[in-house]
Every structure is written in structure tokens, then in C-alpha cells.
Amino acid sequence: MSGSSWPRAVFERIHTVSSDPWGVGSRPYERDKYRHTLTLLAGRRFHHALELGCSIGVMTARLARQCDHLLAVDVAEAALAQARRRCAGLEGVTFYRGQLPDDFPDLPAASCDLIIISELLYFLSRADIARLATHCLRVRQAEAPIVLVNWTGPTDTPCDGNEAARHFIATCLAAGLQVTYARHHAHYRLDMLGHVAKADYQ
């Protein structure tokens, strides 16, 4: 692939070929990723959360238990159709189709107290990663965490997972945020941005 962000048509085609092209509902890697992400957020309740890159809604269904309102975004209508079915019985969950960062949801400034971006950034160009970070900073409440989950294995995307995370984090650091949590697991990295006195690294 080139350095350009992947277009919507690619994701629609991928989800037409397979109902779960990333194995988000079956792979041990995915279960481990969900577990660590939710552990990071354990004990917290969120009023307005934003999930970018919700795919078929596996993480959405789990995250919804901690949220009064959850807006889940994906580029592929085929993926969102599955996500809607999966989350049909859950209150407060809304889905939105958009090609990020161009179609970022029209949300009020400082309206989200949690933003999660999972397995999305490396499909974007470096310029689009910076634009997405700017959008997130605008809608983020002052104390809200931004959580990044990125696959770090080989990929033919515009950036690999580590590069994508670094570019997003750099934009946030320039705006005054700090890395409050960073862990590198076997196949993915989990980062959280916010405001604290001391970052937690391992």
C-alpha cells in the first residue's frame, strides 16, 4: 500500500469477503487485547464515550457496560451492520459511519470523557493521524483519557502500529497532554494519554 490513508471501498470489500476479517470475535490476541484495555479502565464510569474503529462491535458491547452513552464509529457499513445486531439490546449505544478524519462526528467541544482508538491509526497517513488527533483534542473533556490500541506486527498499511502511535502521541504532547500509561505486549501496544504528574512506563 502507498502512504495514503486506506479508502472506504477497501474496508467494505474486506468485510464483504469475510464477516470477521480481523478475527476480532475469535482470536486469542483479540481477547487478550480487550481484557487489558478494559482492565485499564476498570472501576470507571463514563458519561459520553467515543470509540473510533469499532469494527463489528465486539469491544463496543463490552465497553458499553461502563458508559451511559457510547458513540461507536467505523468506515464500513458491512461492519456496522454486524455491530448494530451485536449491540441491539444495549442502551445508550449509537453507531456512526464515517471515513476518518474527514467524517469525524460533529460533536460539541469538550463533550467526551473517554476516547478509544483501536486498530485504526495505522490505516491512516501521517497527516491524517495528526488531523484525527486534533479532532480528538477538541472534543475531549479536560480530564478525559484517550486510549490507543495498535497492532505492532508486520503490516502493509501507510504506517506500522508503532509509527502510528508515535505520530498521534506527538500531536497530543504538543497540546499539553502526557502519556499516562504505556505497555508493549507481544503483538500490540496500549497507550493512554491524559494529565498526570508522572507517566507509568514498563
Language-model segments: what does each one mean?
Residues I116:
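A conserved beta-strand element that flanks and buttresses the S-adenosyl-L-methionine
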Residues M1-L52, I56-P108, L124-Q202:
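Class I (Rossmann-like) S-adenosyl-L-methionine-dependent methyltransferase catalytic domain
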Residues L120:
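Hydrophobic adenine-recognition pocket in adenosine-nucleotide-binding enzymes
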